[in-house]
Every structure is written in C-alpha cells, then in structure tokens.
Regions:
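Sec-dependent bacterial lipoprotein signal peptides
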Residues: 1-3
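Carbohydrate-active catalytic/glycan-binding domains of CAZyme proteins
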Residues: 5-308
Length: 308
C-alpha cells in the first residue's frame, strides 16, 4: 500500500525551489493514526520513520497491533510503505495479540534490525520482551528473530550505533531507564544492562543521538498539571552509557496525554519528531509530527516550536 501525502502549498514553484525549507504541515501523516516516531536516515539518502499505530475507534493502548514505516526525501512528500509487522507474526508473543508499542530500528552490515516491545504472556505488564525482526530492506520483508535475553520487562527500545560500530540498546518504563551494549549480532547483550544515572524525572521514551561528539539522551517526563502532560527532556554525556547531566526541557506538552519522540539530522538540518492528538482530539488516536530543532552554541537544545 503506497500512499503519498503532499502539502497543497508545495505545488507552487516558489515552494519547490525552497527545497528542504518547506515541510508538510503537521501532522504529516493523516490517513491513519500513528505514534512514537523513531526517525533514521539510511544509506539510500531517505529519512525513514518507524511508528506505532493507534486503532480507530480507540481502545486505549492495548489494541496497538501493527507497525508502518513512512519515508521522505524532501520533508514534504511522505510515502507509507505499509505494514511491516503485527502481533500475529510474533511466535513467542501473547496469544491475545495487541500491545505492539513504541519501536526502533538500526542498521548494521547490510541488515536492518527492527526492535519492538511485546508481552509474552496474557498478564502483559510483567512479561514485556524486546523483540527483534530483520530484513535486507528498510521498510519491507521483516522476519521475527526472537527477543533479547537478559533485559528487564520494560518497554521503549532504543538502539544507537556509535561511529565505531558499537551498538547500544536502551529500554525503560516506570521511571527507570537502562542501557547496555549489544554484541555484533545485534540480538544479544554484551554484558548486563545498567541504570542510566543523572536523569531527572524520567518517565519513558528514551532516544539517543550524537551531536558534536557529545551523547544526548532524550525522554518524556512525568509532568501532569491536569491539562498538560509529558514534556520532552534531555541530558548530555561524554559516554553512550552516562553518567548523564540533565539539561532541561526541549519540548513543552502537546495536546496528547503522552509524548514520545526522536531527534535526527537530515540534509544538514536537525529535526524533532513527536506525536500529538491534533487530528482526532483524543488521547489514544495520536498523530506523528516533526519540527526543526536547533542547538545553542554551548550544545544545549533550544525549545522546539510546535507548528501546524
């Protein structure tokens, strides 16, 4: 199922010549409900977003049951590559299905590794595993390979491959964030996971990126004033596994009960991906969005302006 959503304003010659300065309006995916965007730029030069899927009509987060991949080469025209995985394809997964929550993807030596949280038992909350599916393509033909042994039953996998080829995996939930090294096969831990130190008010949604030789761990906090919820925060370290120095908030709450995002550089511009409920007005029918992200000279992140 190929689907391209084009911003109507991009039809003018002026917008076309603006190139990367023009972006599709938010939310940039409007034909289905999406959340938890993990964005990566792969060797083909396109930017890919791996997202979870909210089922309409909403039934909370228990029925999130499949993953789609979206890609762009200009931040204006987006392609839906269709579904790459659902719970019925997970041999070790809970028989009732559902619970396919925020994913991530990594690339190493010709293979794409798709990481997803899924419970193995009817009693889902304490049986979370981080599953791995592999493909030779970034957005199709993924096959489940099992799950990573030795990780706590938490959610929100994030995999970061450093410049030297060493891969790190993170997961979290319930106010705890853990990280560790992966072996070269990308599906086994190299050693044990350890708690990430120095984070303030960590809730969930770990994301790692590197900028000017420093490592950034971003996440959602526990902010709740009754109307506004998760803010996006970040911390900086000289090492992928910390200790981390908390630097503050880079995104204020959206209109959604949750937030979950990623930070990526594409064609010389940094971007912040996140989700809101602008399309539906309902907490569990979310939509992925993106806005430009800027750094201060000292490496701190400026507050991201959420646009429509």
């Amino acid at each position: 199922a190929m689907f391209s959503c084009q911003s109507p304003k991009s039809n003018s010659a002026k917008e076309e010549t603006a190139g990367i300065d023009s972006m599709a309006p938010n939310p940039f995916i409007t034909h289905m409900y999406t959340a938890d965007p993990s964005a990566h730029v792969w060797a083909d030069g396109r930017l890919y977003v791996y997202a979870s899927h909210d089922i309409d009509p909403p039934r909370g987060c228990d029925l999130m049951d499949r993953y789609h991949v979206f890609s762009t080469d200009d931040m204006v025209n987006w392609t839906d590559h269709g579904e790459i995985l659902n719970s019925s394809q997970v041999p070790w997964g809970r028989k009732e299905g559902g619970f396919m929550w925020a994913p991530d993807c990594a690339y190493k030596d010709g293979t794409y590794y798709f990481y997803f949280p899924h419970p193995s038992d009817t009693k889902w909350n304490n049986s979370w595993k981080i599953g791995v599916a592999t493909s030779k393509e970034p957005a199709a033909n993924f096959t489940v390979q099992g799950y990573i042994e030795g990780m706590d039953p938490m959610i929100d996998p994030c995999v970061f491959v450093d410049d030297d080829g060493q891969a790190y995996i993170y997961n979290g939930g319930g106010g705890i964030c853990k990280g560790g090294k992966l072996k070269d096969n990308m599906i086994e831990l190299d050693g044990t996971m350890r708690t990430m130190e120095g984070l303030v008010d960590f809730h969930e949604a770990t994301w790692i990126h590197k900028h000017n030789g420093k490592y950034y761990l971003s996440y959602s906090d526990n902010h709740d004033d009754g109307e506004k919820h998760n803010r996006m925060c970040y911390a900086i370290s000289d090492s992928p596994l910390g200790p981390w120095e908390y630097k503050g908030i880079y995104m204020e709450p959206t209109d959604s009960y949750t937030n979950h995002g990623s930070i990526v550089e594409f064609k010389g511009q940094w971007y912040s991906f996140y989700h809101n409920s602008a399309l539906s007005g309902q907490d569990w029918l979310r939509s992925i969005c993106v806005d430009k992200l800027y750094y201060n000279p000292d490496g701190t992140i400026k507050m991201v302006k959420q646009t429509k």
